Protein backbone atom coordinates (compact mmCIF):
# COMPACT_ATOMS: atom_id res chain seq x y z
CA UNK A 1 0.00 0.00 0.00
CA UNK A 2 1.37 3.41 -0.99
CA UNK A 3 0.20 6.92 -0.12
CA UNK A 4 0.51 10.07 -2.24
CA UNK A 5 -0.76 13.66 -2.21
CA UNK A 6 -2.06 16.10 -4.85
CA UNK A 7 -3.14 19.70 -4.38
CA UNK A 8 -4.10 22.99 -6.03
CA UNK A 9 -5.55 26.27 -4.78
CA UNK A 10 -8.94 24.74 -3.97
CA UNK A 11 -8.39 21.08 -3.14
CA UNK A 12 -5.88 18.81 -1.46
CA UNK A 13 -6.14 15.07 -2.06
CA UNK A 14 -4.51 12.13 -0.33
CA UNK A 15 -4.78 8.67 -1.89
CA UNK A 16 -3.81 5.22 -0.67
CA UNK A 17 -3.36 2.54 -3.33
CA UNK A 18 -4.23 -1.10 -2.65
CA UNK A 19 -4.19 -4.37 -4.59
CA UNK A 20 -6.82 -4.84 -7.27
CA UNK A 21 -6.54 -1.17 -8.32
CA UNK A 22 -8.58 -0.23 -5.24
CA UNK A 23 -7.89 3.34 -4.11
CA UNK A 24 -9.07 5.16 -1.00
CA UNK A 25 -9.01 8.93 -1.29
CA UNK A 26 -9.56 11.86 1.05
CA UNK A 27 -10.54 15.10 -0.72
CA UNK A 28 -10.19 18.30 1.34
CA UNK A 29 -11.81 21.47 -0.04
CA UNK A 30 -11.20 25.02 1.15
CA UNK A 31 -14.12 27.35 2.00
CA UNK A 32 -14.20 28.88 -1.49
CA UNK A 33 -15.50 25.55 -2.82
CA UNK A 34 -18.22 25.08 -0.22
CA UNK A 35 -19.22 28.74 -0.47
CA UNK A 36 -19.73 28.37 -4.22
CA UNK A 37 -21.68 25.13 -3.74
CA UNK A 38 -23.82 26.79 -1.06
CA UNK A 39 -24.59 29.72 -3.35
CA UNK A 40 -25.63 27.34 -6.17
CA UNK A 41 -27.69 25.23 -3.75
CA UNK A 42 -29.56 28.28 -2.48
CA UNK A 43 -30.21 29.43 -6.05
CA UNK A 44 -31.55 25.99 -7.03
CA UNK A 45 -33.92 25.76 -4.07
CA UNK A 46 -35.06 29.38 -4.39
CA UNK A 47 -36.16 29.09 -8.01
CA UNK A 48 -38.50 26.23 -7.11
CA UNK A 49 -40.32 27.78 -4.12
CA UNK A 50 -43.07 30.38 -3.82
CA UNK A 51 -43.41 32.49 -0.68
CA UNK A 52 -46.29 34.87 0.10
CA UNK A 53 -45.55 38.38 -1.09
CA UNK A 54 -42.78 37.34 -3.48
CA UNK A 55 -42.72 36.19 -7.07
CA UNK A 56 -41.44 32.67 -7.70
CA UNK A 57 -37.67 32.60 -7.32
CA UNK A 58 -37.50 36.17 -5.96
CA UNK A 59 -37.69 35.57 -2.21
CA UNK A 60 -34.72 36.88 -0.15
CA UNK A 61 -31.93 34.36 0.43
CA UNK A 62 -32.11 34.55 4.20
CA UNK A 63 -35.85 33.73 4.25
CA UNK A 64 -35.40 30.82 1.82
CA UNK A 65 -32.52 29.42 3.85
CA UNK A 66 -34.45 29.79 7.07
CA UNK A 67 -37.60 28.07 5.83
CA UNK A 68 -35.98 25.48 3.56
CA UNK A 69 -32.77 24.74 5.42
CA UNK A 70 -33.08 20.96 4.92
CA UNK A 71 -33.46 21.27 1.14
CA UNK A 72 -30.59 23.75 0.92
CA UNK A 73 -28.36 21.45 2.98
CA UNK A 74 -29.21 18.44 0.81
CA UNK A 75 -28.48 20.35 -2.39
CA UNK A 76 -25.25 21.74 -0.90
CA UNK A 77 -24.01 18.24 -0.06
CA UNK A 78 -24.96 16.94 -3.51
CA UNK A 79 -23.07 19.74 -5.27
CA UNK A 80 -20.08 19.43 -2.95
CA UNK A 81 -19.88 15.68 -3.54
CA UNK A 82 -19.96 16.24 -7.31
CA UNK A 83 -17.28 18.96 -7.13
CA UNK A 84 -15.07 16.70 -5.01
CA UNK A 85 -15.42 13.81 -7.46
CA UNK A 86 -14.57 16.09 -10.39
CA UNK A 87 -11.47 17.31 -8.55
CA UNK A 88 -10.45 13.72 -7.83
CA UNK A 89 -10.90 12.77 -11.50
CA UNK A 90 -8.93 15.77 -12.78
CA UNK A 91 -6.10 16.13 -10.26
CA UNK A 92 -5.23 12.58 -9.29
CA UNK A 93 -3.21 10.25 -11.54
CA UNK A 94 -5.21 7.25 -10.28
CA UNK A 95 -8.51 8.24 -11.83
CA UNK A 96 -11.71 6.26 -11.19
CA UNK A 97 -12.59 3.87 -14.01
CA UNK A 98 -16.02 5.50 -14.13
CA UNK A 99 -18.58 6.98 -11.72
CA UNK A 100 -19.90 3.41 -11.32
CA UNK A 101 -16.45 2.32 -10.12
CA UNK A 102 -16.92 4.29 -6.90
CA UNK A 103 -17.66 1.74 -4.20
CA UNK A 104 -18.47 4.30 -1.53
CA UNK A 105 -18.43 8.04 -0.97
CA UNK A 106 -19.01 9.78 2.34
CA UNK A 107 -19.09 13.47 3.17
CA UNK A 108 -17.11 13.84 6.37
CA UNK A 109 -17.63 17.59 6.75
CA UNK A 110 -19.34 20.24 4.64
CA UNK A 111 -19.61 23.81 5.84
CA UNK A 112 -19.80 27.03 3.79
CA UNK A 113 -17.51 28.76 6.28
CA UNK A 114 -14.92 26.09 7.03
CA UNK A 115 -14.82 24.05 3.81
CA UNK A 116 -15.30 20.30 3.78
CA UNK A 117 -13.93 16.85 3.09
CA UNK A 118 -15.11 13.70 1.31
CA UNK A 119 -13.84 10.12 1.53
CA UNK A 120 -13.97 7.93 -1.59
CA UNK A 121 -13.27 4.26 -2.16
CA UNK A 122 -13.06 3.33 -5.83
CA UNK A 123 -11.39 1.24 -8.50
CA UNK A 124 -8.88 3.08 -10.64
CA UNK A 125 -7.37 2.62 -14.05
CA UNK A 126 -4.37 0.29 -13.80
CA UNK A 127 -0.81 1.56 -13.88
CA UNK A 128 0.93 0.02 -16.89
CA UNK A 129 4.74 0.21 -17.01
CA UNK A 130 6.60 0.98 -20.22
CA UNK A 131 6.21 -1.91 -22.63
CA UNK A 132 9.47 -3.84 -23.23
CA UNK A 133 9.07 -4.34 -26.98
CA UNK A 134 12.44 -6.05 -27.23
CA UNK A 135 10.93 -8.94 -25.22
CA UNK A 136 7.93 -9.40 -27.52
CA UNK A 137 7.80 -13.06 -28.53
CA UNK A 138 5.73 -13.35 -31.69
CA UNK A 139 6.10 -16.49 -33.82
CA UNK A 140 6.70 -16.20 -37.54
CA UNK A 141 3.52 -16.19 -39.65
CA UNK A 142 2.35 -19.63 -40.70
CA UNK A 143 2.13 -20.22 -44.46
CA UNK A 144 -1.30 -19.97 -46.03
CA UNK A 145 -2.88 -23.41 -46.33
CA UNK A 146 -2.80 -24.80 -49.86
CA UNK A 147 -6.18 -25.89 -51.21
CA UNK A 148 -6.16 -29.61 -52.02
CA UNK A 149 -8.41 -31.54 -54.36
CA UNK A 150 -10.09 -33.01 -51.29
CA UNK A 151 -10.84 -29.50 -50.02
CA UNK A 152 -12.32 -28.66 -53.41
CA UNK A 153 -14.48 -31.80 -53.47
CA UNK A 154 -15.76 -31.09 -49.96
CA UNK A 155 -16.54 -27.56 -51.06
CA UNK A 156 -18.52 -28.88 -54.02
CA UNK A 157 -20.48 -31.16 -51.68
CA UNK A 158 -21.44 -28.14 -49.61
CA UNK A 159 -22.47 -26.28 -52.76
CA UNK A 160 -24.58 -29.29 -53.77
CA UNK A 161 -26.67 -28.82 -50.62
CA UNK A 162 -28.16 -25.80 -52.40
CA UNK A 163 -29.81 -28.23 -54.82
CA UNK A 164 -30.47 -30.99 -52.28
CA UNK A 165 -33.87 -32.58 -51.85
CA UNK A 166 -34.94 -32.26 -48.22
CA UNK A 167 -37.59 -34.85 -47.39
CA UNK A 168 -39.19 -35.25 -43.95
CA UNK A 169 -39.35 -38.98 -43.21
CA UNK A 170 -41.20 -41.12 -40.69
CA UNK A 171 -38.45 -43.71 -40.39
CA UNK A 172 -35.90 -43.55 -37.55
CA UNK A 173 -32.99 -41.19 -38.05
CA UNK A 174 -29.75 -42.48 -39.49
CA UNK A 175 -26.24 -41.31 -40.30
CA UNK A 176 -26.27 -38.31 -42.63
CA UNK A 177 -29.83 -37.21 -41.82
CA UNK A 178 -30.69 -33.83 -40.40
CA UNK A 179 -32.92 -33.51 -37.37
CA UNK A 180 -34.84 -30.50 -36.13
CA UNK A 181 -34.61 -30.18 -32.35
CA UNK A 182 -36.16 -27.96 -29.72
CA UNK A 183 -34.75 -27.73 -26.21
CA UNK A 184 -36.62 -26.42 -23.18
CA UNK A 185 -35.66 -26.06 -19.53
CA UNK A 186 -38.14 -26.25 -16.67
CA UNK A 187 -38.36 -26.93 -12.95
CA UNK A 188 -39.14 -30.55 -12.20
CA UNK A 189 -42.24 -31.06 -10.06
CA UNK A 190 -43.22 -27.38 -10.15
CA UNK A 191 -46.72 -27.05 -11.65
CA UNK A 192 -46.28 -23.29 -11.97
CA UNK A 193 -43.01 -23.60 -13.89
CA UNK A 194 -43.34 -22.57 -17.53
CA UNK A 195 -40.80 -24.28 -19.81
CA UNK A 196 -38.36 -21.78 -21.30
CA UNK A 197 -36.89 -22.35 -24.75
CA UNK A 198 -33.12 -22.60 -25.03
CA UNK A 199 -33.53 -23.11 -28.76
CA UNK A 200 -36.36 -24.09 -31.12
CA UNK A 201 -36.30 -25.88 -34.48
CA UNK A 202 -32.54 -25.95 -34.64
CA UNK A 203 -31.08 -28.25 -37.27
CA UNK A 204 -28.30 -30.74 -36.59
CA UNK A 205 -26.59 -33.13 -38.97
CA UNK A 206 -26.17 -36.61 -37.56
CA UNK A 207 -22.50 -37.15 -38.20
CA UNK A 208 -19.22 -37.47 -36.35
CA UNK A 209 -18.07 -34.14 -37.75
CA UNK A 210 -21.03 -32.17 -36.40
CA UNK A 211 -21.93 -33.99 -33.18
CA UNK A 212 -20.14 -35.28 -30.14
CA UNK A 213 -20.41 -39.04 -29.64
CA UNK A 214 -22.78 -38.75 -26.67
CA UNK A 215 -25.03 -36.24 -28.44
CA UNK A 216 -25.13 -38.36 -31.58
CA UNK A 217 -26.01 -41.48 -29.58
CA UNK A 218 -29.07 -39.72 -28.14
CA UNK A 219 -30.59 -38.92 -31.52
CA UNK A 220 -29.55 -41.77 -33.79
CA UNK A 221 -32.39 -44.21 -34.58
CA UNK A 222 -35.15 -41.96 -33.21
CA UNK A 223 -38.31 -40.76 -34.98
CA UNK A 224 -40.24 -37.51 -35.20
CA UNK A 225 -41.92 -36.72 -31.89
CA UNK A 226 -39.26 -38.48 -29.83
CA UNK A 227 -38.56 -36.74 -26.52
CA UNK A 228 -35.59 -36.94 -24.23
CA UNK A 229 -35.93 -35.69 -20.67
CA UNK A 230 -32.80 -35.24 -18.65
CA UNK A 231 -32.40 -34.06 -15.09
CA UNK A 232 -29.71 -31.46 -14.42
CA UNK A 233 -27.62 -32.51 -11.45
CA UNK A 234 -25.08 -29.70 -11.60
CA UNK A 235 -26.03 -26.85 -9.26
CA UNK A 236 -24.08 -24.43 -11.47
CA UNK A 237 -26.12 -25.30 -14.55
CA UNK A 238 -29.36 -25.24 -12.54
CA UNK A 239 -28.49 -21.74 -11.41
CA UNK A 240 -27.53 -20.53 -14.89
CA UNK A 241 -30.69 -21.93 -16.51
CA UNK A 242 -33.07 -21.40 -13.58
CA UNK A 243 -34.30 -24.97 -13.91
CA UNK A 244 -33.35 -28.60 -13.38
CA UNK A 245 -35.03 -30.46 -16.25
CA UNK A 246 -34.00 -30.44 -19.92
CA UNK A 247 -36.50 -31.60 -22.53
CA UNK A 248 -35.35 -32.30 -26.09
CA UNK A 249 -38.04 -32.79 -28.75
CA UNK A 250 -37.37 -34.16 -32.24
CA UNK A 251 -39.56 -32.01 -34.50
CA UNK A 252 -38.57 -33.69 -37.75
CA UNK A 253 -36.18 -36.20 -39.29
CA UNK A 254 -35.05 -34.98 -42.70
CA UNK A 255 -33.41 -37.05 -45.40
CA UNK A 256 -30.99 -35.13 -47.58
CA UNK A 257 -30.35 -36.18 -51.15
CA UNK A 258 -27.70 -34.13 -52.94
CA UNK A 259 -27.30 -34.41 -56.73
CA UNK A 260 -24.04 -34.55 -58.62
CA UNK A 261 -22.93 -31.12 -59.72
CA UNK A 262 -22.87 -30.49 -63.48
CA UNK A 263 -22.63 -27.61 -65.95
CA UNK A 264 -26.36 -26.84 -65.77
CA UNK A 265 -26.36 -26.49 -62.00
CA UNK A 266 -23.15 -24.49 -62.14
CA UNK A 267 -24.85 -21.99 -64.48
CA UNK A 268 -27.64 -21.55 -61.92
CA UNK A 269 -24.91 -20.33 -59.58
CA UNK A 270 -23.70 -17.70 -62.06
CA UNK A 271 -20.79 -19.83 -63.33
CA UNK A 272 -20.19 -20.61 -67.01
CA UNK A 273 -19.57 -24.30 -66.40
CA UNK A 274 -18.68 -26.81 -63.71
CA UNK A 275 -14.99 -26.12 -64.30
CA UNK A 276 -15.61 -22.40 -63.97
CA UNK A 277 -17.49 -23.06 -60.71
CA UNK A 278 -14.52 -25.06 -59.43
CA UNK A 279 -12.19 -22.16 -60.26
CA UNK A 280 -14.42 -19.71 -58.41
CA UNK A 281 -14.75 -22.11 -55.50
CA UNK A 282 -10.97 -22.48 -55.32
CA UNK A 283 -10.58 -18.70 -55.17
CA UNK A 284 -13.16 -18.57 -52.38
CA UNK A 285 -11.39 -21.32 -50.43
CA UNK A 286 -8.03 -19.61 -50.93
CA UNK A 287 -9.48 -16.36 -49.58
CA UNK A 288 -10.85 -18.26 -46.59
CA UNK A 289 -7.41 -19.78 -46.02
CA UNK A 290 -5.84 -16.32 -46.10
CA UNK A 291 -8.41 -15.08 -43.61
CA UNK A 292 -7.72 -18.09 -41.36
CA UNK A 293 -4.00 -17.29 -41.49
CA UNK A 294 -4.78 -13.65 -40.62
CA UNK A 295 -6.93 -14.74 -37.67
CA UNK A 296 -4.17 -17.07 -36.45
CA UNK A 297 -1.66 -14.22 -36.68
CA UNK A 298 -4.11 -11.96 -34.83
CA UNK A 299 -4.52 -14.57 -32.08
CA UNK A 300 -0.74 -15.01 -31.81
CA UNK A 301 -0.38 -11.23 -31.43
CA UNK A 302 -2.99 -11.21 -28.66
CA UNK A 303 -1.08 -13.93 -26.81
CA UNK A 304 2.26 -12.17 -27.30
CA UNK A 305 0.97 -8.83 -25.99
CA UNK A 306 -0.79 -10.43 -23.01
CA UNK A 307 2.42 -12.24 -22.05
CA UNK A 308 4.64 -9.19 -22.52
CA UNK A 309 4.08 -7.64 -19.11
CA UNK A 310 2.12 -8.10 -15.88
CA UNK A 311 0.39 -5.39 -13.88
CA UNK A 312 -2.35 -5.04 -11.27
CA UNK A 313 -5.89 -5.25 -12.68
CA UNK A 314 -9.22 -3.84 -11.44
CA UNK A 315 -10.66 -6.67 -9.38
CA UNK A 316 -14.33 -6.04 -10.24
CA UNK A 317 -13.67 -6.17 -14.00
CA UNK A 318 -11.63 -9.32 -13.48
CA UNK A 319 -14.35 -10.91 -11.36
CA UNK A 320 -17.15 -10.00 -13.79
CA UNK A 321 -15.25 -11.37 -16.80
CA UNK A 322 -14.33 -14.55 -14.92
CA UNK A 323 -17.96 -15.14 -13.92
CA UNK A 324 -19.11 -14.60 -17.50
CA UNK A 325 -16.52 -16.94 -19.00
CA UNK A 326 -17.10 -19.59 -16.33
CA UNK A 327 -20.79 -19.57 -17.15
CA UNK A 328 -20.12 -19.79 -20.90
CA UNK A 329 -17.65 -22.65 -20.58
CA UNK A 330 -19.83 -24.72 -18.24
CA UNK A 331 -22.95 -24.19 -20.36
CA UNK A 332 -21.01 -24.99 -23.52
CA UNK A 333 -19.78 -28.24 -22.01
CA UNK A 334 -23.28 -29.21 -20.86
CA UNK A 335 -25.46 -28.05 -23.76
CA UNK A 336 -23.14 -27.97 -26.79
CA UNK A 337 -20.63 -30.71 -26.13
CA UNK A 338 -23.41 -32.52 -24.29
CA UNK A 339 -21.36 -33.69 -21.33
CA UNK A 340 -23.21 -35.63 -18.67
CA UNK A 341 -23.33 -34.25 -15.12
CA UNK A 342 -20.56 -36.62 -14.07
CA UNK A 343 -18.40 -35.68 -17.08
CA UNK A 344 -19.02 -32.01 -16.36
CA UNK A 345 -17.98 -32.46 -12.75
CA UNK A 346 -14.72 -34.10 -13.88
CA UNK A 347 -13.98 -31.21 -16.24
CA UNK A 348 -15.29 -28.41 -14.01
CA UNK A 349 -12.07 -27.47 -12.25
CA UNK A 350 -10.10 -27.36 -15.49
CA UNK A 351 -12.83 -25.27 -17.15
CA UNK A 352 -12.89 -22.81 -14.25
CA UNK A 353 -9.09 -22.47 -14.32
CA UNK A 354 -9.30 -21.88 -18.06
CA UNK A 355 -11.97 -19.22 -17.51
CA UNK A 356 -9.80 -17.53 -14.89
CA UNK A 357 -6.79 -17.41 -17.22
CA UNK A 358 -8.90 -16.23 -20.16
CA UNK A 359 -10.50 -13.51 -18.02
CA UNK A 360 -7.13 -12.18 -16.91
CA UNK A 361 -5.89 -12.17 -20.49
CA UNK A 362 -9.01 -10.35 -21.74
CA UNK A 363 -8.87 -7.62 -19.08
CA UNK A 364 -5.12 -7.15 -19.59
CA UNK A 365 -5.62 -6.75 -23.33
CA UNK A 366 -8.42 -4.24 -22.77
CA UNK A 367 -5.93 -1.82 -21.19
CA UNK A 368 -2.81 -2.86 -23.10
CA UNK A 369 -4.43 -2.23 -26.48
CA UNK A 370 -5.37 1.29 -25.37
CA UNK A 371 -1.74 1.91 -24.43
CA UNK A 372 -0.46 0.51 -27.74
CA UNK A 373 -3.01 2.59 -29.67
CA UNK A 374 -1.78 5.73 -27.91
CA UNK A 375 1.95 4.98 -28.11
CA UNK A 376 1.79 4.05 -31.78
CA UNK A 377 -0.19 7.18 -32.64
CA UNK A 378 -2.93 5.14 -34.28
CA UNK A 379 -6.16 6.78 -35.38
CA UNK A 380 -9.73 5.98 -36.33
CA UNK A 381 -11.29 7.61 -39.37
CA UNK A 382 -14.86 8.85 -39.46
CA UNK A 383 -15.71 6.21 -42.09
CA UNK A 384 -14.28 3.41 -39.95
CA UNK A 385 -16.22 4.60 -36.91
CA UNK A 386 -19.48 4.86 -38.86
CA UNK A 387 -19.03 1.38 -40.32
CA UNK A 388 -18.35 -0.15 -36.91
CA UNK A 389 -21.31 1.71 -35.41
CA UNK A 390 -23.51 0.15 -38.11
CA UNK A 391 -22.13 -3.28 -37.20
CA UNK A 392 -22.81 -2.71 -33.50
CA UNK A 393 -26.29 -1.40 -34.28
CA UNK A 394 -27.19 -4.49 -36.33
CA UNK A 395 -25.93 -6.74 -33.54
CA UNK A 396 -28.14 -4.98 -31.02
CA UNK A 397 -31.27 -4.18 -33.03
CA UNK A 398 -31.11 -6.47 -36.06
CA UNK A 399 -31.45 -5.08 -39.58
CA UNK A 400 -33.90 -2.35 -38.59
CA UNK A 401 -32.77 -0.10 -35.74
CA UNK A 402 -35.49 2.00 -34.07
CA UNK A 403 -36.12 5.39 -35.65
CA UNK A 404 -36.34 7.13 -32.28
CA UNK A 405 -32.97 5.92 -30.97
CA UNK A 406 -31.91 8.04 -27.99
CA UNK A 407 -28.80 10.18 -27.75
CA UNK A 408 -27.64 7.98 -24.86
CA UNK A 409 -27.86 4.89 -27.05
CA UNK A 410 -26.00 6.64 -29.87
CA UNK A 411 -23.23 7.57 -27.44
CA UNK A 412 -23.08 3.97 -26.23
CA UNK A 413 -22.76 2.72 -29.82
CA UNK A 414 -19.98 5.25 -30.44
CA UNK A 415 -18.07 4.06 -27.36
CA UNK A 416 -18.47 0.37 -28.20
CA UNK A 417 -17.46 0.94 -31.83
CA UNK A 418 -14.42 3.00 -30.80
CA UNK A 419 -13.33 0.37 -28.27
CA UNK A 420 -13.56 -2.38 -30.89
CA UNK A 421 -11.57 -0.41 -33.44
CA UNK A 422 -8.96 0.56 -30.85
CA UNK A 423 -8.51 -3.09 -29.91
CA UNK A 424 -8.34 -4.32 -33.50
CA UNK A 425 -5.92 -1.67 -34.70
CA UNK A 426 -3.61 -2.19 -31.72
CA UNK A 427 -3.46 -5.97 -32.19
CA UNK A 428 -2.92 -5.58 -35.93
CA UNK A 429 -0.03 -3.25 -35.12
CA UNK A 430 1.44 -5.96 -32.89
CA UNK A 431 1.09 -8.53 -35.66
CA UNK A 432 3.20 -6.39 -38.00
CA UNK A 433 6.98 -6.61 -38.08
CA UNK A 434 8.54 -6.39 -34.64
CA UNK A 435 10.84 -3.56 -35.62
CA UNK A 436 7.79 -1.39 -36.33
CA UNK A 437 6.86 -1.59 -32.68
CA UNK A 438 9.97 0.11 -31.37
CA UNK A 439 8.29 3.25 -30.00
CA UNK A 440 9.22 5.80 -27.42
CA UNK A 441 6.75 5.57 -24.53
CA UNK A 442 4.79 8.76 -24.03
Swiss-Prot record:
InterPro entries: PPIase_dom_sf, Trig_fac, Trigger_fac_C, Trigger_fac_C_sf, Trigger_fac_ribosome-bd_bac, Trigger_fac_ribosome-bd_sf, Trigger_fact/SurA_dom_sf. It is found in: Cytoplasm. One of its GO terms (cellular component) is cytoplasm. One of its GO terms (biological process) is protein folding. Keywords: Cell cycle, Cell division, Chaperone, Cytoplasm, Isomerase, Rotamase. Residues 176-259 form the PPIase FKBP-type domain. Its EC number is 5.2.1.8. One of its GO terms (molecular function) is peptidyl-prolyl cis-trans isomerase activity. It is an enzyme of class 5 (isomerase). It catalyses: [protein]-peptidylproline (omega=180) = [protein]-peptidylproline (omega=0). Involved in protein export. Acts as a chaperone by maintaining the newly synthesized protein in an open conformation. Functions as a peptidyl-prolyl cis-trans isomerase. Belongs to the FKBP-type PPIase family. Tig subfamily. Consists of 3 domains; the N-terminus binds the ribosome, the middle domain has PPIase activity, while the C-terminus has intrinsic chaperone activity on its own. This is Trigger factor. It comes from Chlamydia trachomatis serovar L2 (strain ATCC VR-902B / DSM 19102 / 434/Bu).
Amino acid sequence: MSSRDFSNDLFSINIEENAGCVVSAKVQANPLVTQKCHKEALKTVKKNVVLPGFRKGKAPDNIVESRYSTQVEQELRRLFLRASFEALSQMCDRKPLSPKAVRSSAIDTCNPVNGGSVSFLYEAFPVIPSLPWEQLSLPDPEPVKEISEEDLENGLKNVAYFFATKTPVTRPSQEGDFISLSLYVSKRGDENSTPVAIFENKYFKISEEDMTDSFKARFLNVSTGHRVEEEIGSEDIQSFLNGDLLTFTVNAVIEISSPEMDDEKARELQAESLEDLKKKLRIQLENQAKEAQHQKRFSDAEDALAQLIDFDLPESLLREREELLSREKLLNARLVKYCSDSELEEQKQALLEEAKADARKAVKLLFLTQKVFSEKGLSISREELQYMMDVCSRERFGGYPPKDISNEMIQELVLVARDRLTYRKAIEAISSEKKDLEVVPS
